[in-house]
Amino acid sequence: MATFHDIIGQEQIKEHLQNAISAKKISHAYIINGEKSSGKEFIARVFAMTLQCEKGGTEPCQECHSCKQALSDNQPDIIYVSHEKPNTISVDDIRAQINNDIAIKPYSSPYKIYIMNEAEKMTPQAQNAILKTLEEPPEYAVIMLLTSNVNSLLPTILSRCVVLNMKPVADEQVRNYLMHQLQVPDYKAEVCVAFARGNIGKAKSLASSEDFDNIKNEALSLLKYIQDMDLSEITAAI
């Protein structure tokens, strides 16, 4: 499922985006800032799918042609910006996938939406290139920059975007999600919640990880011997 209802926590972000949809006051540029695996891309996907939904509500219907395309990552007016180099988004990436493409009107939808994950990897030249588009975007364009380090982006980019900051999800919400949605046993859910620290993606990854038992045993061992360990040993263990 991919609706706002399926987003765990992040009530302020959900409210902001759904209010914008309801009022038809969509910004041309958004930044979603939060740590890795916190759910930034899922929120961006839901928002994009809702904007393009043919039924025009504040939730994607998941039944229309556009929603079905979006669910299979084949919606032509929702573009996921990629980069060949693992640690760098280059100026060529920006020019080829955004700047040279954005002037082409949407194929079949009201908006043309660009979603860029790991936006902090943009080089200074890439940031300056996208800045030119942010300064004078077409009326149908929506650019979503997802980042784990908002401070890596130019102040001039920040000033032209709506910045939405992810917050840690309450432990109880994470626990309920693991136990009721993923059928994770309660003892395992408790350990995952403790390690995830409000990061729903991290909790989900831990719960499904083959390394879970190793992590649990290491944690129990640390607790057992912590009184006999010096600070450097504790730091190394963590």
Regions found by a protein language model. Give the residues of each.
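A broadly conserved amphipathic alpha-helix scaffold signal in soluble, globular proteins
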Residues: 99, 132-135, 179
